[in-house]
Amino acid sequence: MKRAVVVFSGGQDSTTCLVQALQQYDEVHCVTFDYGQRHRAEIDVARELALKLGARAHKVLDVTLLNELAVSSLTRDSIPVPDYEPEADGIPNTFVPGRNILFLTLAAIYAYQVKAEAVITGVCETDFSGYPDCRDEFVKALNHAVSLGMAKDIRFETPLMWIDKAETWALADYYGKLDLVRNETLTCYNGIKGDGCGHCAACNLRANGLNHYLADKPTVMAAIKQKTGLK
């Protein structure tokens, strides 16, 4: 039996990964992390979606220690979430240092226990918010270290790494879940479900990708099929 663990936040990217994983694996587990994030609603959204989509199990892990160590606008109410600035340089204050290091490592430990061969994460390097822990080289390096440390080949999969947001929408649509991803996921840094606040960086990426996809569905769908090998 093929098993996978999805690092699951209930946002657009991880939900699209879950939708695809359910088609590719016999048994899919979801792991969501409670790190004292600014908007706890994402945990509730993740619970609802994991149940609705048919994950074998959904585990919410308490990692609130991360909140004490990592100062970010996503962990501190006193730090405002910035509006999207297309020309902004550097790492944004929404970056939570060490988050993906911790999440992927703990997900791998869980995968070890349930005998899963893969940990799936929705990180992307094509159009992202400048987070260093979303890069392909980081994921591969951590995957190598974790596999060595466990003496087990647990594979980190990043199905969205080299596709853009328009193609991520196309992937959801390919599996018949575009409306669900649009209306029932929570990606917004200000904690607003669906289309979100419309002015944070996460909402801007999401909306621009959706508009691009809806404006030229055939071209974008053809591109995602070519990149992923979907028929």
Swiss-Prot record:
InterPro entries listed in its UniProt record: QueC, Rossmann-like_a/b/a_fold
- Family matches, as Pfam families: QueC
Q: What organism is the protein native to?
A: Escherichia coli O127:H6 (strain E2348/69 / EPEC)
User: What pathway or pathways are given for this protein in its record?
Assistant: Purine metabolism; 7-cyano-7-deazaguanine biosynthesis
Q: Which UniProt keywords apply?
A: ATP-binding, Ligase, Metal-binding, Nucleotide-binding, Queuosine biosynthesis, Zinc
Binding-site list for ATP: F8, S9, G10, G11, Q12, D13, S14, T15, T16, C17, L18
Q: Which domain of life is it from?
A: Bacteria
| Example GO BP | queuosine biosynthetic process
Reaction catalysed by this chain?
Answer: 7-carboxy-7-deazaguanine + NH4(+) + ATP = 7-cyano-7-deazaguanine + ADP + phosphate + H2O + H(+)
NCBIfam families named among the record's database cross-references: 7-cyano-7-deazaguanine synthase QueC (TIGR00364), PRK11106.1 (NF008317)
Q: What does this protein do?
A: Catalyzes the ATP-dependent conversion of 7-carboxy-7-deazaguanine (CDG) to 7-cyano-7-deazaguanine (preQ(0)).
Q: What is its EC number?
A: 6.3.4.20
Which interval of the chain is the signal sequence? Answer: none
The family line of this record is: Belongs to the QueC family.
The cofactor(s) it depends on are:
Zn(2+)
Does Zinc show up as a keyword for this record?
yes
Protein's recorded name: 7-cyano-7-deazaguanine synthase
Q: How is the cofactor bound?
A: Binds 1 zinc ion per subunit.
**Which GO-annotated molecular functions does the record name?**
ATP binding; ligase activity, forming carbon-nitrogen bonds; zinc ion binding
Its organism's taxonomic lineage begins at:
Bacteria, Pseudomonadati, Pseudomonadota, Gammaproteobacteria, Enterobacterales
Indicate which residues the UniProt annotation says bind Zn(2+). Answer: C188, C197, C200, C203
